[in-house]
């Protein structure tokens, strides 16, 4: 799946507007406050005309006495409107960013496993953090400048044309050139912003890789390797940032230079007698000040172009992400609790991008309440079969049935509630042990149920020694627990779920011999009246299985009970001899 980012700015903004309009009341208040702010600035400039023509030009005028009150009132209004607009827009943009992040997060949870196989986790995190934050630039800072500076420009232009349309006509000649310059730098900003997003994802991935593998880095002395790698990607980010800053720095003087030409022309025209005769000192000062006043909003609009384009580029990437097809869930069949009979019928499967199949024409049955074990060397396809049971992937051909119904016909969430999985790669959440055992169960289980599951998994042996017991927070991915302890918590989670089909994917591989023996007795109890698929490396754990399948190169090469396979003296017997040091 590739993300199509060829989407117009206008279309992207229209999609972003669906989030912004949810908070249109706050937006409306902010826009009104921004307009008031801009009008107060324009009115301040307009006071120069009566100040010069009446205040200093007429001894009878009382304008100078009222001017301090006017200025104070305008500054007060300007301050209040500035606070209101900033607060309201921050509230709007904060909510929009929150909604966008939730949208991306929720879509991640709907994506198929194959998507995460191809994407770097650092890039995925960057979309939730960096890209989502950039959207704020388009919904707050950019909007502030567009409304306030846009209103200022309109107000100053009206003021100029009202006082001297002849001098103001010069701007009509300059405006197209300014518009072209802003359009040109907008395209440049857009391109650089896209590159910055990509580079930020690479930076995040590089840092995450080091943090997750820091023990390997330290053990193998890889500090210099990681330092060099991060130096390269961080320098790439710096280069992209400098390109953006260079474009911004060049855009401002170019536009100011164009505007200064207009000012030069105005100064020249003001010296022409036919125009000069119509000007008063106040009129000329207002027009000239308004033209100078246009510099600031024009500069701000040029700067906001980069902010707006960064926000649009980020929004475009995020919308392209949520446009990706989620995990297929076309099934409608649902059952409260399956009986647990599993039939695997001539299935074949190839991972996306792989040249050869991971599984080829595999068939076997697991009767209700029986145990089937899969053994074989690493990479032979054992875990792939388990992933197909729960539809983390879909078969290319053949079918897997649960109680005689194709698993693709089940409603996906309902299907997965029929399975409990304990794998060799245990993932625990940064939460209490109790909440990890009862993960996603809500109030379905009582405290006693959780304790009983922990007892059966022999987890209470170490939990009871902890100060907070089941309320102990385990840290990120169970960092405060040993490998064996994490495995016992995972087994307790599966025990509590009490699903009709149990998948044990190297479930005891992280345990020492004593712990394995203790937990194996709990697993034996758990497997009663359940359909069990066991993927094992230690053959001692599956000798009691009703049927053992030897998987090699994606195909079943042997099947039978432990004693039958030993007697056959084939691949299984050879594995057995290697593990137990026989002959």
UniProtKB/Swiss-Prot annotation:
PROSITE patterns: ABC_TM1F, ABC_TRANSPORTER_1, ABC_TRANSPORTER_2, MSBA. One of its GO terms (molecular function) is ATP hydrolysis activity. Keywords: ATP-binding, Cell inner membrane, Cell membrane, Lipid transport, Membrane, Nucleotide-binding, Translocase, Transmembrane, Transmembrane helix, Transport. Its EC number is 7.5.2.6. It is an enzyme of class 7 (translocase). InterPro entries: AAA+_ATPase (IPR003593), ABC1_TM_dom (IPR011527), ABC1_TM_sf (IPR036640), ABC_transporter-like_ATP-bd (IPR003439), ABC_transporter-like_CS (IPR017871), ABC_transpr_lipidA (IPR011917), P-loop_NTPase (IPR027417), Type_1_exporter (IPR039421). NCBIfam families: MsbA_lipidA, PRK11176.1. This is ATP-dependent lipid A-core flippase. The lineage of its organism: Bacteria, Pseudomonadati, Pseudomonadota, Gammaproteobacteria, Vibrionales.
